[in-house]
Amino acid sequence: MKWYEVRVSTTDEASDAVSEMLTTMGAGGVAIKDPFDIKKEILKPNSLDYADDEFLESLGEDVVIQAYFQSGNDIDKLLKQINEGLVNISQFLNIGKGLEGYNEVDDEDWSTAWKKYYKPLQLTDRIVIKPTWEDYSPNADEIVIQMDPGMAFGTGTHETTQMCSILLDKYMKDDTEVLDIGCGTGILSIIAAKLGAKQVEAIDIDEVAVKVARENIELNQEITKVSARKAVLSDLKAEEHKYDIIVANIIANVIIDLSSQIPYYLKKESLFITSGIIKERKQEVIDACEKNGMSRIETLEMGEWVAMVFKCPDTL
């Protein structure tokens, strides 16, 4: 079988959104080469990797995303859809150079191309993400999440996912009921379940994303705790069910739009954990949530990104 290797040159801030878009368009796998991550890893004080200044400079500034689609796809139509998706993302984030082109590669080349990029990743102090084929011996207190590269494993490295994971780990209790808005690959829903959530409901507006999330949920043996479906928040009946934690790793515009609805779906004294917010939009999100009766209790920042926790003192 042959594959189309589609290359997109983007920015660190837009890489997660772009890789998620390519996955939902049907990519068999997505490889992300982020010079910022490479530099960060190499420059750690305890890193065993060595690189001279010339190599570090050669990495450049662009995040290169390679997405692999089966060659049976209409490539012209696919490229048009990708360009349209990039235009949509560019309304909220700086996407950089954008679509650079494609190559046709053999099945063997494809497998060589993506496997080398996927290794076990320490997402937080005790949460590890690993590709399905990699062996990993966890420590006693570590939680291991399995992700298949065809399901955009690379997106778990993004700062917004890391911060949401840290906050879920901090605030999760054994009897917690969680709603994951804009679940994407389902990674946060699975993490919530592994951390002891009683029940997790995952929703997304994209049907392909929901399919991917369901596959990931099954892969991690959490189908009894986690359900995923195509829906928007208003499809859920607030009078029938409320949640202890709502998590939303989405863009600032959507968070602001949802801020008036969130309190209706939270139990009294419950939490709204949100990220996907660039620093420049932080205050807008704070203002919107506080206007709707929520109070900010914690803020995390990584790179250009912000995550926040809001408490809802009363249910509506």
UniProtKB/Swiss-Prot annotation:
Localisation: Cytoplasm
Disulphides: none
Binding residue positions for S-adenosyl-L-methionine: T161, G182, D204, N249
Alphabetized GO MF terms: protein-lysine N-methyltransferase activity
A Pfam cross-reference name: PrmA
KW Methyltransferase (keyword) present: yes
Taxonomy, superkingdom: Bacteria
InterPro entries: Ribosomal_L11_MeTrfase_PrmA (IPR050078), Ribosomal_PrmA_MeTrfase (IPR004498), SAM-dependent_MTases_sf (IPR029063)
Gene3D superfamilies assigned to the protein according to its UniProt record, in alphabetical order: Vaccinia Virus protein VP39 (3.40.50.150)
Enzyme Commission number: 2.1.1.-
GO biological process: methylation
GO cellular-component term (any): cytoplasm
Catalytic function, reaction form: L-lysyl-[protein] + 3 S-adenosyl-L-methionine = N(6),N(6),N(6)-trimethyl-L-lysyl-[protein] + 3 S-adenosyl-L-homocysteine + 3 H(+)
Enzyme class: transferase
Keywords: Cytoplasm, Methyltransferase, S-adenosyl-L-methionine, Transferase
Function: Methylates ribosomal protein L11.
UniProt-listed PANTHER family: ELECTRON TRANSFER FLAVOPROTEIN BETA SUBUNIT LYSINE METHYLTRANSFERASE (PTHR43648:SF1)
HAMAP family: Methyltr_PrmA
Family: Belongs to the methyltransferase superfamily. PrmA family.
Full protein name: Ribosomal protein L11 methyltransferase
Organism: Ruminiclostridium cellulolyticum (strain ATCC 35319 / DSM 5812 / JCM 6584 / H10)
Gene this protein is translated from: prmA
